[in-house]
Each structure stands twice: as structure tokens, then as C-alpha cells.
Amino acid sequence: MEGKSLLFKEFAGLDSFPIVLDTQDTEEIIAAIKAIAPTFGGINLEDISAPRCFEIEDRLKAELNIPVMHDDQHGTAVVVLAGLINALKIVEKTLSNVKIVISGPGAAGTAVAKLLSLAGAKNIVLLDSK
């Protein structure tokens, strides 16, 4: 988490620091973040597994007046989209004319599929072992 704070400072000029919670209870996480939110300009959630991550992020976005992002979902999706766009340039293809397969549509895979679709991907397949 400290490393993520360094990246925020280095690449975006944002001052940040990690706050680690010793709970996996959805209500406790939401209450703790809501209590400290007025002192922050944004909240970056990290290492919250699905399906809890969806409810926590959605509720915090609805209840707070600052940006809330679950990095495991959206940070991963942005990196995948950037890499895919650059790879497709090399092979002279576009998102709209390739087949994309995502193995394991958990929190990150689901967010990747949503972002790729918004970016113009037309043929996305999600595979799950269950």
C-alpha cells in the first residue's frame, strides 16, 4: 500500500497515505471510510474481494461527495486497455475486430470487460470454471 502512495505522488502529484483496516465486514469497512472521508479528496480501495467490493464501492460512491475507486477493478482495467490498444496498433487491428477472452471474471475481469466494451470491443468472452 505504501508503494501505491509513492506511485500517486510520482505520477500524479497526489499526496496519499495508506489506511489499513483490520476487518472484512462490509458494514465496518463502509463506516470506517465514511468517518474519515471528509479529510480526503478521494478514496482508493484496495484488496477487497468480490462480491463485497462491488457493494462497498457502489455505496461509497452514492454516499460520499468525493471520488471512490476500487483499484483492483478499475486500475487493472485501465492497464489492460492501454496494453491491448498498444498491442493492437503493432498488429494493425482494432478493438472492434478482435475476439477477447477473459479467464476468471472476478472483480478485475468484470471491470476489464466493461471498460473494453466501452472502448469499442465487440467480441468479449468471459470464462469461469464454476
How should these model regions be labeled?
Residues 24-27, 74-78:
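A short acidic, often aromatic-flanked loop/helix-cap motif at beta-alpha or helix-coil junctions
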Residues 19, 46, 70, 102-103, ...:
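Active-site-adjacent beta-strand anchor residues
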Residues 38-39, 45, 68-69, 116, ...:
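A glycine-rich helix N-cap at a beta->alpha junction
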Residues 1-66:
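N-terminal ligand-binding/catalytic initiation module
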Residues 1-12, 78-130:
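Glycine-rich phosphate/diphosphate-binding loop of Rossmann-like nucleotide-binding domains
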Residues 63-77:
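Short, acidic/small-residue loops that bind anionic groups at enzyme active sites
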Residues 46-53, 74-75, 105-110:
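Gly/Ser/Thr-rich loops at beta-strand to alpha-helix junctions
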